[in-house]
Regions:
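DNA major-groove recognition helix of helix-turn-helix/homeodomain DNA-binding modules
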Residues: 54, 58-75
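Short alpha-helical DNA-recognition segment
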Residues: 25-50
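Short, charged recognition helix plus adjacent turn
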Residues: 1-8, 67, 74-87
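DNA major-groove recognition helix of helix-turn-helix
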Residues: 35, 51, 61, 80
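DNA-binding alpha-helical recognition surfaces that contact promoter or target DNA
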Residues: 15, 19, 33, 49, ...
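A short, Lys/Arg-rich alpha-helix, primarily the initiator
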Residues: 1-24
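Alpha-helical residues within the helix-turn-helix
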Residues: 22, 33, 67
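Helix-turn-helix DNA-binding elements, focusing on the entry/boundary residues of the two helices
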Residues: 17, 28, 44, 59-62
Length: 87
């Protein structure tokens, strides 16, 4: 399988993941634990690689990231500017 990149990054949402994580005051490890509780088996290193654009974020992971970070998937994808918590 070929992985396509944009400006050397495998995902576009990593910067937003980091922004939301820091806004919530979470460490990468704490975010990994929240994701594990939602059924996504990732560790701190995977979160780091997502944030730096070195890891692909499959479509099934995006809603779980959004839920863990209390944001929308559209915000993670850059389609919304407001990072307000979702209701």
């Amino acid at each position: 399988m070929r992985i396509y990149t944009l400006d050397g990054k495998c995902n576009l949402s990593g910067v937003r993941v980091k922004e939301a994580r820091l806004r919530l005051g979470l460490s990468q490890e704490a975010l990994a634990v929240k994701l594990q509780l939602l059924g996504l088996q990732v560790g701190q290193m995977a979160v780091s690689r997502i944030e730096t654009g070195k890891r692909v974020v499959p479509d099934f992971e995006l809603p779980l990231l959004a839920e863990a970070l209390n944001v929308t998937t559209d915000w993670l994808l850059g389609k919304e500017n407001s990072s307000e918590h979702r209701e």
